[in-house]
Amino acid sequence: MTGFDSIQVRFKNTTHRQSPFANTRVVPFVQSYLNILKSVIDDVKTEYFWFFANFMSLEEIDLDYIPEQHEKDQIHVWYNTNLKGGTNREGNVFLIPTAKFKEQMDNLKFLRDFKDINYHSHNNLFQN
């Protein structure tokens, strides 16, 4: 696995899955992913960091993923396309470039307003 920092967002009243990362900070869901990111970004010390909901299974994601040179400034989002697993086009698993997020965060109204987002569809990314 990469040595990237990770942030797990804890939702109430849902199945909780343990983070596969040793260096995970768990934070409660408050208002929006963007607000959470703004509140924790100064604690992130790695070039990229994983950001994901506690109800997501990360078993099918390549946790060693490192963006290609032409994708290095993008937020990478994995989302499920299997109806049995629940769908959310905006996703609940992210790999975020720390410096680029810091550059843009004050001008974002919504996380989806980030300049460059790379959506990775996945047919077996279960959530509950």
Residue ranges and their predicted role:
Residues 65-128:
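Catalytic-site signature of metal-activated, phosphate-bearing donor transferases
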Residues 37, 62-63:
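Conserved strand-to-helix beginnings and helix N-cap segments that scaffold or border functional pockets
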